[in-house]
Amino acid sequence: MTDIATLGEFGLIKRLTKDIQIKNPSTKYGVGDDCAVLHYPKTEALVTTDMLMEGVHFDLTYMDFFTLGYKSAMVNFSDIFAMNGFPRQIIVSIALSKRFTIEDMDSFYQGMQAACDKWQVDIVGGDTTSSRTGLAISITCIGEAAKEDIVYRSGAKETDLICVTGDLGAAYMGLQILEREKAVYYSQIEDYNKKVNQAKELHDEAKLKALQQQRQAFEDFQPDFAGKEYLLNRQLKPEARGDMIQRLRALNIHPTAMMDISDGLSSELMHICEQSNCGCRIYEKEIPIDYQTAVTAEEFNLNLTTCALNGGEDYELLFTVPIGDHEKIKNMEGVRQIGYITKPNLGCMLVTRDSNEFQLQAQGWNPLQQK
């Protein structure tokens, strides 16, 4: 493993960006000067940014650098797709401590590049700096859309149908599995260290030797995730739903409002209703949930509907369409109609399987909440 200090900031940037190939006509100049040069003569530019902090947004105990790079890019693409546009460029800034190596950053950039290649996105610039502890990542994504194609959160109208892509709650259940296995691993390490300290206090050399032989087993620890791969991928390596934007356009369906589901269905739906000055009514039985999500929620003794409503990080699309598009969308694979838009005075309601009604609560993840 190579210390980053051996290259320095500019050497690191040169190494990480040397193989970047420009793909978009709108990218006039990328990495290598004081600024990137972009040109959008006939479309609107869409700009979004996300900051990811180690220990808050990601955990390197169970996330490798390639996967981190991939996810960091994809969550930004998701915001652009949620505006009914397509991502074109990203700018990447990283603050990292001395504990990270050049090889770590190589892997991170390879993951980002894999995500960019999937949607023909150019990496056009960024910055690197040192951090006293941990890793911080900030990515700005620039996309484009024709003015008439852009979809805001504020366009939902009474009687519009509420739709979601894919299934919900899987990413949250993937996180529960990872956190459980992490807890088991650290519990075993704590128990091991306790035994080592006891043996040292007793000067028990035979016991210490036996414990030393066990150490490799901890270092090689690999949890059994058999049958849970789908849930883990939804958490660690989400896919931004640009494919659904392409399919909606092919069917000539123009959403009236749209968001990506990063903080949870309930939270995002309430954002749309607030900005569109409307209410909503969704049906518990219509919320799409994968079988593995349901099985795992039962294992953890968690309420399945709550996981789907508030789990977050699904990066599916939540959107509304005019009721006149019902015939077009009802048989669209991978899309579920879960309810409809109502008058604002009727509130945001969930109708349960037994026909009871409850006010939706925005319990999505809050990064500023004190723990």
Regions found by a protein language model. Give the residues of each.
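Glycine-/charge-enriched secondary-structure boundary and capping motifs
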Residues: 2-21, 63, 96-122, 130-137, ...
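Small-aliphatic-rich amphipathic alpha-helix that forms the alpha element of a beta-alpha
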Residues: 65-89, 110-118, 247, 267-271
